[in-house]
Amino acid sequence: MHRDGRKPSLTGAGVTPSGLCIIGSGYSAAALLLHLEARGAPMDGVTVIGPQALGTGQAFGCVNDDFRLNVRAELMQVWPDDPGHFANWAATNIAGDREADTDVGAFYRRRDFASYIASEIRARPALASLPHIKASAVNISASGDGWDIELDDGSATGASRIVLATGNPPPVWPFREQIADTPSLVRVPWRGDWPENIDGGARIVVIGSGLTALDAIHTLRHRQHHGGITLVAPDGMLPPVQTGWRDADALEWPQDVRASGFLKFMRDTVGDIPWEDTEWQRRFESLRYHISAAWQRLDAADQGRLMRRFGWLWSLARFRAGPQAFGSAQMLLDTGQLDIVTDMVTGITTTSGGVHDVGLATGARLSADAVINCSGAGRDPLITRILDNGTAARHQTVSHRPAMTSELALIRADGTPHGNMFGIGPMTSHVAGDVLGSASIARQARGLAARLVQ
């Protein structure tokens, strides 16, 4: 509410079918809506566009109980001022999950967090009854003071203001010549419905070594898979396991540094402690509190330099594995069932007998009965479209992402910020530095909600 008692407006200047349209229906969209509602914003002018149930998205729309959150419950936060909210909800509403509790905290199933977000939405009638168009946006174009939005079902709608909350786009195969999806060529493994199509003795190649790869290994072990598993990744490294770190105080980053000073501050902070240690993670988490502001003070060239040289290492340190998945990987490594190959997959061909021939950059080849693509998110076709048609300018160093202001407004081709097009969540990570986890997206949602209701 405004101080004079008036409700804030979300409609902007344009007169179109929707005052505010949130494009995307995953966690980022849900977090923004929850924070808008918490600020008393009227919901009668808000529309959501997205194919999935609100709050599920790629991260939490799982059907596989082996796919778990990679952080303990109290770090999964939609309400920054009440960090234990999900943990308290889970303690009351989740029963019979004997695998959740570990020595360093409770790591619930990914789908449990989706259930929690759904319960938060149901508790707010204005959100539960929001218009939700179950489609995907494929193009956005200017229309007077607002926007026309084309959908993949052939229909269209409009809005005065747009927030792009498109999340992580589905993966593509990490080589030039794309191949068709089949039950044994799993391009998008995030939902977790593929293991039932894999024979227990199948030779499996897993592409990538991050959290999705560990999810795949964990569910295969749980299903008593006895075939060999080969993991192929350029760095040949698995992420470290989560520790029981506590009391990470926010550090103030130095002002006006270049890439070298940015990196030096990080190295000096974590010191020479092995990254497996609890103290190393505590220090690392201290860096993350204000990294977004520090990152935005770097010029684009320095941002690009750091991303090219150290982005992969930051991701490994940032996205540590939950104890359950990490334990499964270590078990299979110890028994020799899992092998890690430091290489890159360059292509896959399939014989008439259904065997997949996996080519590697070194010239080596692997034979597999199934290939699971855990190489990470692909490129967002909607973002690509609005960059190609000039609706938004390209980022200087990450050219497949939009240029954005520190207040999350997309920038026009002429260099001026849009006053009615914003972004939130993973699609902003290149400008915000580290906005991918639930807590950091929640903080971002809180700030954007405050600006939208002004």
Language-model segments: what does each one mean?
Residues H2, R6-A53, G57-C62, E99-V257, ...:
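Flavin (primarily FAD) cofactor-binding/catalytic cores of flavoenzymes
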